[in-house]
UniProtKB/Swiss-Prot annotation:
This is sn-glycerol-3-phosphate import ATP-binding protein UgpC. CDD domains: ABC_MalK_N. Keywords: ATP-binding, Cell inner membrane, Cell membrane, Membrane, Nucleotide-binding, Sugar transport, Translocase, Transport. GO terms for cellular component: ATP-binding cassette (ABC) transporter complex, substrate-binding subunit-containing. SMART domains: AAA (SM00382). The lineage of its organism: Bacteria, Pseudomonadati, Pseudomonadota, Gammaproteobacteria, Oceanospirillales. The complex is composed of two ATP-binding proteins (UgpC), two transmembrane proteins (UgpA and UgpE) and a solute-binding protein (UgpB). SUPFAM superfamilies: MOP-like, P-loop containing nucleoside triphosphate hydrolases. It is an enzyme of class 7 (translocase). Transmembrane segments: none annotated. Belongs to the ABC transporter superfamily. sn-glycerol-3-phosphate importer (TC 3.A.1.1.3) family. Its EC number is 7.6.2.10. It catalyses: sn-glycerol 3-phosphate(out) + ATP + H2O = sn-glycerol 3-phosphate(in) + ADP + phosphate + H(+).
């Protein structure tokens, strides 16, 4: 069991490139933190710094309150699970899991006990004598996890461990990782570019962009109250709809002149962006309090079974408006729909991409989150 603390962690390479800009983060004992972001955002560099594989340029890294900046990887009591499994092909499943314990000089009886217990935990009992080439992708990943679990580390680090698996196996292993982490209670940091993994696994989510932490919080808090346009666009599939708007008294104005009544705090005439998620665009007849009603034309439909995605156009606006409809909806291409923008689900972002507080609504959201 362990806590992690990162204070002002910076990583700058000799060529002048800065990969991490003053990262501050605390991870509680037994917590599973997922770090998510696009390629090049710094998430893998952060993981390597935690593991001791990259030196820190500035700042302090502490495990259980102890500074570990200069501590060698082997002395940090951390176990990593990689995307490429990192198994020894000439060793059996049992041999792969026992390897680190043998190197430590652990007694043979203790090794046998831990191998048996770990194999039972992961459902590998019948595979202990097989070689990695005789295993499926999911089985190999379980062996890789077993090799980490058997060491009984203070901290787990996961480096995109499901990237090489097909969609069905990813779902299965996602559930398995979450179950095991909760059962074992080991503090974990999980890096991924997959937002579904991030949303479903995390106790808390850290969204990174360009070496900065954009936002940190519970998955649903970030989904419902993104601090920046980047977070709003990165979380959610399909992504949040964005419309260019101009601030005016009592709300914002769309490029086609339509007014949207919102309690946003923006100076008159400021350029901004209005955001709303596809599932929150509803037909006007089904809406409650609406900020505006938009008449759109359906240009393309994507039936997904339970849902149908409608790609619509609003006159005078170049971007799509994507609407998530019920799968049984009788929408057809070329049809006109009247859509309501519910006030409670509208987001306004300023020219810098920061979320603009809504008068009254922010207080209500803060109280609801307590």
């Amino acid at each position: 069991m362990a806590t992690l603390r990162l204070d002002g962690i910076r990583k700058r390479y000799p060529n002048g490139m800065t990969a991490l800009h003053s990262i501050d983060l605390s991870v509680a004992d037994g917590e599973l933190i997922v770090v998510v972001g696009p390629s090049g955002c710094g998430k893998s560099t952060l993981l390597r710094i935690l593991a001791g594989l990259e030196p820190i340029t500035a700042g302090e890294l502490a495990i259980n309150g102890r500074r570990v900046n200069e501590l060698e990887p082997a002395a940090r009591d951390i176990a990593m699970v990689f995307q490429n499994y990192a198994l020894y092909p000439h060793m059996s499943v049992a041999g792969n899991m026992a390897y680190a314990l043998k190197n430590r000089g652990t007694p043979k009886d203790e090794i046998r006990r831990r191998v048996a217990n770990t194999a039972a935990l992961l459902g590998l009992d019948d595979l202990l004598e097989r070689r990695p080439r005789q295993l499926s992708g999911g089985q190999r990943q379980r062996v890789a996890m077993g090799r980490a679990i058997i060491r009984e580390p203070q901290v787990f680090l996961f480096d995109e461990p499901l990237s090489n698996l097909d969609a069905k196996l990813r779902v299965q292993m996602r559930l398995e990782i979450r179950r095991l982490q909760k059962r074992l209670g080991i503090t974990s940091v999980y890096v991924t570019h997959d937002q579904v993994e991030a949303m479903t696994l995390a106790d808390r989510l850290v969204v990174m962009n360009g070496g900065h932490v954009e936002q940190c919080g519970t998955p649903m808090a970030l989904y419902a109250r993104p601090a920046t346009r980047f977070v709003a666009s990165f979380l959610g599939s399909p992504a949040m709809n964005f419309l260019p708007v101009t601030a005016h008294a009592g709300g914002v104005v769309l490029p086609n002149g339509a007014q949207v009544a919102l309690p946003a705090i923006l100076p008159e005439g400021d350029a901004a962006t209005l955001g709303i998620r596809p599932e929150h665009l509803v037909e006007a007849t089904a809406s409650g309090e609406a900020a505006a009603t938009l008449d759109v034309t359906v240009e393309m439909l994507e039936p997904l079974g339970a849902d149908t995605l409608a790609y619509t156009r609003l006159p005078g606006v170049e971007t799509w408006l994507v609407v998530r409809l019920d799968g049984a909806h009788a929408a057809r291409e070329g049809q006109r729909l009247s859509l309501a923008l519910p006030v409670a689900h509208c987001h306004v972002f300023d020219a810098r991409g920061a979320r603009v507080p809504m008068t009254g609504r922010e207080d209500a959201e803060a109280l609801a989150a307590q």
